[in-house]
């Protein structure tokens, strides 16, 4: 099964074939323009091996070169600064010394137990990608072709996963208690909780729970935060009464979130918040945010193979904000 192929003019076609391409799983990823691409899926520590095939399209042609190489690259690109591209992994295998190609050739390559410290990611302002890069070095213009891979970071957590329970309110007007069953959720998990009204002296017209994603790029004064509402869950439509308790069930599997990503190579972070929103009869909106951790659960087969694998995140911190009076 061919991995990908590309034409470099009428002379030579470059093709990369992975050794386990027929059995390796593939994963999908949305590009910055909203299209969905499918590439081979790898995990941290897995080897990457295969063949680079160079096929001449026209018999009798020659291709002089200054060397042929393949690279395994991990790269972070900030969209608002295309010149600021950072490579956190760059492994090189020389395939051929300077010479001349007169016929089709194949070259074996292998990158052993490659460290892939971060998850592949494409967001509003940043892209983290892994790719194989084949270069035929020439005097004037190199022939270069890139082949994307997708990397997933797997995480396991100890049995302790504390629930979130808070009482919030507006003095003498509204007092509620909310509870979520966990503070850490895997990407296919269900957020279960409840809202309990202790005091209601303002007329609430609408109440919903939002899952908010915040992508933070840059450092210091150049920091940019992009906020996106991933999911909305209507808790109630109408006025609650004192003592009323309303259950919450939000299924994450339907929204395809990414894992939480903390200070990735000091370039960006991706964080998730549960945002409780109340709207009163005068259309004033009240918010209460609570950070949660999202993590990628290993498939059952891999969980058995990776019993020593463990990934930790720092504890989430609660944040609160409001356009109108804070709860």
From Swiss-Prot:
Comp. bias (Polar residues): 316-327
GO biological process: endocytic recycling; intracellular protein transport; retrograde transport, endosome to Golgi
Domain of life: Eukaryota
Region of interest (Disordered), ranges: 306-327
Localization: Cytoplasm; Endosome membrane; Early endosome
Sites bearing Phosphoserine, chain numbering: 315
GO CC, alphabetical: cytosol; early endosome; endosome; endosome membrane; retromer complex; tubular endosome; vesicle
This protein's UniProt keywords: Cytoplasm, Endosome, Membrane, Phosphoprotein, Protein transport, Transport
Record membrane topology: Peripheral membrane protein
Known role: Acts as a component of the retromer cargo-selective complex (CSC). The CSC is believed to be the core functional component of retromer or respective retromer complex variants acting to prevent missorting of selected transmembrane cargo proteins into the lysosomal degradation pathway. The recruitment of the CSC to the endosomal membrane involves RAB7A and SNX3. The SNX-BAR retromer mediates retrograde transport of cargo proteins from endosomes to the trans-Golgi network (TGN) and is involved in endosome-to-plasma membrane transport for cargo protein recycling.
Entry similarity comment: Belongs to the VPS26 family.
SUBUNIT field: Component of the heterotrimeric retromer cargo-selective complex (CSC), also described as vacuolar protein sorting subcomplex (VPS), formed by VPS26 (VPS26A or VPS26B), VPS29 and VPS35. The CSC has a highly elongated structure with VPS26 and VPS29 binding independently at opposite distal ends of VPS35 as central platform. The CSC is believed to associate with variable sorting nexins to form functionally distinct retromer complex variants.
Name assigned to this protein: Vacuolar protein sorting-associated protein 26A
